[in-house]
Amino acid sequence: MTLWLPATGKVYLPPTPPVARVQSTDDYVERTNVFYHAMSDRLLTVGHPYYDVRSSDGLKIEVPKVSGNQYRAFRVRLPDPNKFALADMSVYNPEKERLVWACAGLEIGRGQPLGVGTTGHPLFNKLRDTENNSNYQGGSRDDRQNTSFDPKQVQMFVVGCVPCMGEHWDKAPVCASEENNQTGQCPPLELKNTVIEDGDMFDIGFGNINNKVLSTNKSDVSLDIVNEICKYPDFLTMANDVYGDACFFFARREQCYARHYFVRGGNVGDAIPDGTVNQDHKYYLPAKSDQQQYLLGNSTYFPTVSGSLVTSDAQLFNRPFWLRRAQGHNNGILWGNQMFITVADNTRNTNFSISVSTDNGEVTEYNSQTLREYLRHVEEYQLSIILQLCKVPLKAEVLTQINAMNSGILEEWQLGFVPTPDNSVHDLYRYINSKATKCPDAVVEKEKEDPFAKYTFWNVDLTEKLSLDLDQYPLGRKFIFQSGLQSRPRIVRSSVKVSKGTKRKRS
């Protein structure tokens, strides 16, 4: 007998209002044939590769930290094209259109020779080498050693019109029921998203983690990251961004291998289960009590990685990149007349060793007690950009999407939506500044807020460095050649015939 039964699952109905669809910038931005070249000055920075050198009272930074393992987050400011005195004013109609910039090409120039820089810690938490052992050795109260290594090799850059989004693992809040039982326990972890700022450290082989909070012994990692948060670009989030402003495109090259294999010192927080769960011998068989192996050694193993060979054959820098199609809906449109270029590169990681004598006289013999050794790291950048002039029509559907994306863009264009009319009656005094009436309301003029003011960037001002003469610059000539904007001059052959020489006949 067949019985009809009601459906036990949920019935999903489509939403009654239409779902908003985000359009690509190619759908409403019209590109012109006007291109500009912009190039920065040589951008130089010098500092200590491991930490800030502070004054004796700790209030002033005398030498900043400049490491090859830091991000360089450039904020490039461009002029407002709507305020340009264009040579051809027929390019656009200011009553019906607004001008914006589009990134057509980019070259990140890097100076200085290739080199490998080492990092380390004078009190590194390394009990011993675990790859080649000749005897079984337990730990003592303090087994830290002076250890150094070369970091993972990283070359990377991310280009967008908003800052690059990073991710790292951090300590998570504890549940209320477990707050009083956390002494000596491993804290819960959560993945956090933060903006990558200039000077943030990238992963050098120990992971993207908040070492400030999660490295209590201050010895598990090297000096340059022991008091820092190591971040990694959140490519998944930026690729799925509905507007695609954070990452038009990126280039990435990472390489490393495990060079040394060590074990940590200290007690193991999560003991091997055999020793705590009724000795069920699933992981090891215990040794006799008179052997050294009876007391298990530490099982917290870790490698120190190496970036290996640094070569000019695998460089992402000092070469042009052309943007034809971005990965998101924003195809290179620079909203707000600004561009964010986030760079990570430690292939030019040489640290200078500078020795200075503490004696005033001439140094005639070596004495380590009268010599001081200093470390310095230098970096050199130059940014070159090809900009394309584009037009945005002031249509209702276009302005609606731009307003939903970023209402500040319409304010910069001196546009705005008319608010709903207020039918209430307001009081308007004639002599409001006289003593006979009440004090006028203090109206504070609202200044335009910078949404990225709280972040640290390397500001690069290109508002007065644009040029239409592309052939006068290296990147401009490359752009002209690859885009076919200028054809080669034809070689006109002469129509005059050259007579052949006559041979003399031998007599």
From Swiss-Prot:
A cellular component term, taken from the record's GO annotations: T=7 icosahedral viral capsid
Entry annotated with the keyword Lipid metabolism: no
Keyword Ubl conjugation set for record: no
UniProt cross-references to InterPro entries, sorted A to Z: Capsid_L1_Papillomavir, Capsid_L1_sf_Papillomavir, dsDNA_vir_gr_I_capsid
Pfam family, one: Late_protein_L1
Alphabetic keyword roster: Capsid protein, Disulfide bond, Host nucleus, Host-virus interaction, Late protein, T=7 icosahedral capsid protein, Viral attachment to host cell, Viral penetration into host cytoplasm, Virion, Virus endocytosis by host, Virus entry into host cell
GO BP annotations listed: endocytosis involved in viral entry into host cell; virion attachment to host cell
Superkingdom of this protein's organism: Viruses
Cleavable signal peptide: none
Subcellular location per the Swiss-Prot or TrEMBL entry: Virion; Host nucleus
Oligomer status and interactors: Self-assembles into homopentamers. The capsid has an icosahedral symmetry and consists of 72 capsomers, with each capsomer being a pentamer of L1. Interacts with the minor capsid protein L2; this interaction is necessary for viral genome encapsidation. Interacts with protein E2; this interaction enhances E2-dependent replication and transcription activation.
Family: Belongs to the papillomaviridae L1 protein family.
Role noted for this protein: Forms an icosahedral capsid with a T=7 symmetry and a 50 nm diameter. The capsid is composed of 72 pentamers linked to each other by disulfide bonds and associated with L2 proteins. Binds to heparan sulfate proteoglycans on cell surface of basal layer keratinocytes to provide initial virion attachment. This binding mediates a conformational change in the virus capsid that facilitates efficient infection. The virion enters the host cell via endocytosis. During virus trafficking, L1 protein dissociates from the viral DNA and the genomic DNA is released to the host nucleus.
Protein name, per record: Major capsid protein L1
Source organism per UniProt: Human papillomavirus 37
Gene field: L1
